């Protein structure tokens, strides 16, 4: 059972926990340090890109170790993984805009590609400087009825950002530069034994990534409670 902390204690504990590889969510502790690394590719070339991804839409290339996505259209320009990563997973990458583009770095986990409709099917999707108003945001595809967004992260398009997106039993979380930006509970979680694709999307944007890692998450369910204050 996890005790309640005062605000200054809570902020300090979260910061220290992230430094030690622990993400504290409501009712879950996610142990990043001891999670299983399923995939890692620091720098890409044409061969490693082709081995690991399929281009579905948009323009995608490799430049100086970076995977570069360019799509001027008002729709997803996507690449999808060749391999499935089933279960409770997290994707980590280093991402950066390509000038003059300033928005929409988008990532998919626990997804699928609907070949019949030629579009993304079921999936969890998160975006940085996205969702129309410069938000860190989340949406559940394909109905997009479950969404969340916050404008509070201070995005710098010329800077490299560390982006993490994970899912634990329908508890989806997003960290940017080791700040927990979003935590969403899906009341009808996707079946992660069926949906295992990861993907990357340029939505009317131009950006690049490298340092890609995929983890099978280690976590512990926690009972939360408050200490009486009066």
Predicted regions and their residues:
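Short tryptophan-centered beta-strand motifs in secreted/extracellular beta-sheet-rich domains
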Residues: 44, 91-93, 158-176
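Flexible glycan-contacting loops in extracellular carbohydrate-active proteins
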Residues: 184-211
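Beta-strand-rich interaction surfaces with strong enrichment in secreted/lumenal proteins
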Residues: 77-83, 149-155, 198-199
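Short carbohydrate-recognition loop motifs
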Residues: 58-77
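Extracellular carbohydrate-recognition regions
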Residues: 2-56, 221-230
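Extracellular beta-strand elements of beta-rich domains used
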Residues: 44, 93, 210-217
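Short, aromatic/His-centered strand-loop micro-motif at the edge of beta-sheets
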Residues: 140-162
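Secretory/extracellular carbohydrate-interaction modules
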Residues: 71-139
């Amino acid at each position: 059972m996890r005790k309640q902390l005062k605000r200054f204690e809570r902020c300090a504990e979260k910061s220290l926990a992230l430094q030690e590889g622990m993400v504290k969510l409501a009712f879950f502790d996610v142990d990043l340090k001891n999670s299983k690394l399923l995939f890692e590719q620091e720098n890409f070339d044409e061969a490693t890109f082709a081995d690991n991804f399929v281009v579905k839409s948009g323009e995608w290339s490799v430049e100086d170790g970076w995977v570069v996505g360019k799509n001027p259209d008002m729709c997803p320009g996507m690449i999808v993984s060749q391999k499935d990563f089933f279960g409770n997973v997290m994707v980590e990458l280093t991402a950066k805009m390509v000038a003059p583009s300033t928005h929409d770095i988008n990532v998919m986990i626990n997804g699928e590609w609907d070949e019949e409709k030629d579009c993304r099917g079921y999936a969890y999707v998160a975006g940085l400087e996205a969702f129309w108003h410069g938000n860190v945001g989340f949406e559940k595809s394909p109905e997009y009825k479950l969404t969340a967004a916050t404008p509070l992260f201070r995005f710098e398009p010329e800077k490299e950002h560390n982006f993490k997106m994970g899912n634990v039993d329908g508890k989806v979380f997003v960290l940017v530069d080791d700040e927990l930006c979003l935590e969403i509970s899906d009341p009808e979680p996707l079946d992660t034994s069926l949906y295992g694709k990861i993907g990357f999307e340029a939505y009317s944007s131009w950006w690049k990534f490298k340092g890609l890692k995929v983890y099978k998450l280690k976590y512990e369910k926690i009972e939360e409670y408050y200490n009486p204050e009066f």
